[in-house]
């Protein structure tokens, strides 16, 4: 979320300075990510619009993923052409009377419900969304909304009297119901903890800022269960713009209370247990470090996913997200001057070619097919100041950035869709695509004077993949660096199968095909997956199933029984402890080959996730896509420490 501070690009919270003990400055952080550069494109001069009836008939919920694409229940591409309808996260900027427009973003007092309901009937707002060519809506909320029992002022819903006397959550319910009834897909977005306009040091920096992780998860389960029967509520966007607080950075995979990777994965799997139909949207780290000329600072976005991606119990439910704004940069907070301002380049400073490369490096690389990290990338926030803006660099950036989205056929959500106009008809927030004055009169993107219209229509009307998307093969990594990674629904429902050891379990539809040597990481796939057989899964801790000759003389071996394949493993420190083996429905070959990786990587020349590193800094062994992992050899000799040295790979047929 960006601020309305003057100039438009600068967030007001940069005025605050971190305590001297933190040796820092306030962090205000904008969006993240795009893709490769595109040549100028041409498109219709108006957005392609559907009626609610047409939009509802064009897709069927729930949504899932196939590789880099989101698809509907029929397997047809559903490209998110979305907007952000802000307000329910709060517009108060943190000081003074919460009801004073001067203390709210752009003078807009949302009363903690989506903006515009005081001045325009809900049906008209939705019709205007259709006119923009949107098919989906990111709907921010604060955790405070869930627990708020107060009723909104009548004036806050003056144009929608049916909403009088309702709590903010009940108004949110009504908005969700209206959106989905009119054909829109809705993605719930946990934007803030408290009612507060993001960002900076506002007490909302992480999922567990101003609340516990347990409360955050409980709130998500409440929201998911609340809308579970509405299959047009398609996704849970876990948290907005995770960033540094006064004292510490968020991280990706460190195993502590600030570990976004672990927190998001746990929450995502709990959400899928409550509603297996939901998409789980994970935005990368928006900011780390202290922005000065002498201290480290950066905007990581999705870059950590390259070597440490998330694995959910459902491999077809993960979507990654990123935010991009012209005035921010890979290491630039967006501050114009004073605290937080550095000389690092902004996204608007890059040439089209440079911007395309940066956006790819920070986000769109995730869409590369056949890797452990492959998933759709949703640019869930981007935007620019429109009517009245004279910022040539931002305008050039917007043109170049939308070209990138077009070229890469990228899912997107503009920030924000709805704002207010003042008594003179001027937008109070000129980033909004639609502005309504106190009488309900609309000033929209399609009205004369908004320079963004051509690029918006280019984006909305751009050629895209449509129709059926072919099923894809999945590769997913397991990370036992700091504890178990159990993404098997079956095993989650059972007891501890390797007590006292760290355990990794593949999703129920996948098998284990690779291990890292010394870091306890693993790789799963469903490539050529054999049909699952009946019977118990077997925990193997010794050599009792080595029945077709000693395939690794002098080494300890863990080998699955005949006609079973490895689906999990356990380790103590980094030494092998056990294999978990699942039965196949039909007999499996018992001949195979050894894949030794004690002196270097031994991975297929082609095939799954071979172009990406799921265990950086360690040797990796990996069976081919048409093989199953039947055994692991290890030794305590020669200071090997019991880490895996070889895999027994057998053909699937």
Give each language-model segment a name.
Residues 38-39, 47-136:
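N-terminal carbohydrate-binding accessory modules
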Residues 109-137, 145-147, 153-235, 262-270:
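An active-site-proximal structural segment forming one wall of the substrate-binding cleft
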Residues 1-42:
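Secretory targeting and sorting signals
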Residues 107-114, 118, 208-210, 214-235, ...:
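Extracellular glycoside hydrolase catalytic/binding regions
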Residues 95-101, 105-110, 143-168, 194-211, ...:
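Surface-exposed, active-site-proximal loop segments in enzymatic domains
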Residues 389-480:
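Aromatic-rich peripheral "rim/lid" segments of glycoside hydrolase catalytic domains that contact
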Residues 477-653:
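Lectin-type carbohydrate-recognition ectodomains
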């Amino acid at each position: 979320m960006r601020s309305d501070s003057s100039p438009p690009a600068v967030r007001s919270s940069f005025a605050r300075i971190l305590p001297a003990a933190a040796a820092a400055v306030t962090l205000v952080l904008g969006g993240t990510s795009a893709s490769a550069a595109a040549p100028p494109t041409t498109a219709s001069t108006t957005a392609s619009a559907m009626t609610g009836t047409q939009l509802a008939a064009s897709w069927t919920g729930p949504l899932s993923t196939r590789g880099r694409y989101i698809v509907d229940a029929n397997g047809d591409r559903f490209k998110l052409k979305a907007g952000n309808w802000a307000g329910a996260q709060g517009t108060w900027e943190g000081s003074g009377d919460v009801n004073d427009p001067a203390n709210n973003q752009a003078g807009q007092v949302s009363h903690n419900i989506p903006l515009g309901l005081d001045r325009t009937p809900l049906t008209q707002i939705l019709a205007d969304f259709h006119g923009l060519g949107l098919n989906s809506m990111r709907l921010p909320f604060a955790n405070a909304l869930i627990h708020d029992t107060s009723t909104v002022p009548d004036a806050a819903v003056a144009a929608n009297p049916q909403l009088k006397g309702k709590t903010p959550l009940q108004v949110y319910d009504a908005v969700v119901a209206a959106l989905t009834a009119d054909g829109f897909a809705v993605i719930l977005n946990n934007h803030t903890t408290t009612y507060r306009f993001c960002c900076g040091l506002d007490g909302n920096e992480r999922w567990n800022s101003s609340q516990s992780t347990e409360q955050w998860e409980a709130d998500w389960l409440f929201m998911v269960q609340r809308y579970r029967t509405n299959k047009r509520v398609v996704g849970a966007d876990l948290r907005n713009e995770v960033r540094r607080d006064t004292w510490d950075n968020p991280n990706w995979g460190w195993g502590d209370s600030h570990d976004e990777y672990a927190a998001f994965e746990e929450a995502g799997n709990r959400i899928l247990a409550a509603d297996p139909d939901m998409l789980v949207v994970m935005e990368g780290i928006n900011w780390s470090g202290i922005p000065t000329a002498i201290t480290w600072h950066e905007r990581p976005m999705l870059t950590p996913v390259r070597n440490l991606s998330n694995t959910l119990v459902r491999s077809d439910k993960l979507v990654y997200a990123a935010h991009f704004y012209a005035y921010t940069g890979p290491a630039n907070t967006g501050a114009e001057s004073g605290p937080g301002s550095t000389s690092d380049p902004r996204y608007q400073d890059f040439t089209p070619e440079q911007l395309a490369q940066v956006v790819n490096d920070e986000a769109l690389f995730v869409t590369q097919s056949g890797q452990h990290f492959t998933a759709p990338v949703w640019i869930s926030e981007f935007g620019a100041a429109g009517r009245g803006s004279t910022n040539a660099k931002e305008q050039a950036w917007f043109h170049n950035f939308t070209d990138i989205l077009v070229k890469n056929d990228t899912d997107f959500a503009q920030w924000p869709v709805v704002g207010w106009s003042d008594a003179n008809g001027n937008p109070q927030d000129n980033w909004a695509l639609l502005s309504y004055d106190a009488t309900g009169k609309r000033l929209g993107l399609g009205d004369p004077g908004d320079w963004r219209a051509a690029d918006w229509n280019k984006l909305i009307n751009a050629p895209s993949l449509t129709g059926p998307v072919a099923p894809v093969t999945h590769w997913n990594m397991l990370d036992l660096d700091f504890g178990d990674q159990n993404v098997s629904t079956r095993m989650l429902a059972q007891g501890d199968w390797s007590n006292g050891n760290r355990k990794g379990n593949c999703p129920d539809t996948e098998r284990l095909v690779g291990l890292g040597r010394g870091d306890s990481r693993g790789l799963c796939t469903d490539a050529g997956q054999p049909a699952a057989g009946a019977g118990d899964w077997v925990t193997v801790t010794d050599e009792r199933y080595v029945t077709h000759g000693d395939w690794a003389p002098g080494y300890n071996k863990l080998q699955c029984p005949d006609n079973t394949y490895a689906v999990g493993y356990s380790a103590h420190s980094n030494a092998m402890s056990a294999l978990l083996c699942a039965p196949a429905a039909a007999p499996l070959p018992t001949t195979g080959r050894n894949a030794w990786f004690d002196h270097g990587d031994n991975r297929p020349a082609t095939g799954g996730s071979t172009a990406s590193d799921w265990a950086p800094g360690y040797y990796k062994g990996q069976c081919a896509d048409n093989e199953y992992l039947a055994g692991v050899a290890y030794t305590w000799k020669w200071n090997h420490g019991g880490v895996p040295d070889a895999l027994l790979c057998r053909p699937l047929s």
